[in-house]
């Protein structure tokens, strides 16, 4: 099972926003308490954060799907929904975030550096937030919006000061084990090193990190061997050390030919220039400071080979060190030479100041277009597609099972100028209009304008729409007032009729008189029965 993973494809999705609530305040002696529906909670974000406790992307290799929690639903009594919890994903220092197409989204360097990989969805407004002077008691609420979902690629580029490069079995792992406390796997066969190894070296007062990457072979820049896959771990290094094998067992190899092949592969390798760092430049690998370490001089033929090629290498301008990872010969001089390169690189980094761009406040343009209309054709019929962040978001927030919510959407689109734009594009009543790109969130409808050119609104009061007349008529406020007045008039007429009957003597007998009359009649009936019996 793999223990080191430096590239994964991660599927992240933010939490969905909670729906707004439709509720009316109910309290004793307050039959019309007004709307009190709360807003839905926002969905949680997915954030990548650099942590020194994380050294590999192995966890995301086994579990590549990560989803933040959703926002809670709004409730009555003005209670808002719970906010979705933010999902923090720890990543190693030096992680590069890319799209599947290779576009760099972020380069995460430094403890605590963050990047929002997927934002959570916005919670919907409750009917209390939608009320106004004209809309006192909305019978609808806005729906929550789904969170962002995307597939991102995480690539780990190890952060080291010095990189050891060379052919397989050149002794790179032995060197890093001899110079630091790192304990990489060491064996006497090629490609023993399958993952990058990091070690910390101290030379006097200078402390720096060296990286051991898998061996390079001819054609590594084209994907041969393992070197091309791990060369990105060398991109952040300030200097390189060529580790040359002076005791190779292959007859067609020697330190000079090995160096030429490695230099050619480094020159062919294209450094990722999409992130240029603070100074705005990325130095190619073959132009960075280099040292040459002639390794394995403790062998019988190694010392002779090192003395034979040393003059040639120094003539080319290289600083050459004869070292042995087994006997530790020459390692002290090599470590101090590395420290000099690291110190010089750090001094240059401190001299170069970051270009601080002062914040510029740009007010929103007054006449900025919030949408675009694209005429299309489908099945030889005209089609008009409305695109824009606002219209698409409004469609996602609309509950299409509620006629009043659809009317509210129509009002918003009309105020935004969508209807005027359709007129200008030549749209006619009955033409097909699509809001958004084709997909699950797109809305298709036959356009029936609520406003003709220069005419008044043809639609009724708030919440009504001519396109939904077949669904049933909803009484307007004026109709409700008329019905209420008719009921009051009917009650007044009934009272007047009762009053006229009372004045006519129909209702003059009181309750006590009726009781006395009934008691008298019952006594007379009883005496009549007694006389008949005698």
Swiss-Prot record:
It is found in: Cytoplasm. Keywords: Cytoplasm, GTP-binding, Hydrolase, Magnesium, Metal-binding, Nucleotide-binding. The keyword Protease does not apply. Residues 464-504, 512-526 have a biased composition (Basic and acidic residues). The keyword Nucleotide-binding applies. Mg(2+) binds at residues 173, 193. Its cofactor is Mg(2+). GO terms for cellular component: cytoplasm. Residues 160-343 form the OBG-type G domain. Residues 2-159 form the Obg domain. Disulfide bonds: none annotated. It comes from the Bacteria. It is an enzyme of class 3 (hydrolase). Residues 363-449 form the OCT domain. GO terms for molecular function: GTP binding; GTPase activity; magnesium ion binding. GTP binds at residues 166-173, 191-195, 212-215, 295-298, 324-326. One of its GO terms (biological process) is ribosome biogenesis. Residues 71-82 have a biased composition (Gly residues). An essential GTPase which binds GTP, GDP and possibly (p)ppGpp with moderate affinity, with high nucleotide exchange rates and a fairly low GTP hydrolysis rate. Plays a role in control of the cell cycle, stress response, ribosome biogenesis and in those bacteria that undergo differentiation, in morphogenesis control. Belongs to the TRAFAC class OBG-HflX-like GTPase superfamily. OBG GTPase family. Monomer. This is GTPase Obg. It comes from Renibacterium salmoninarum (strain ATCC 33209 / DSM 20767 / JCM 11484 / NBRC 15589 / NCIMB 2235). The lineage of its organism: Bacteria, Bacillati, Actinomycetota, Actinomycetes, Micrococcales. The gene is obg.
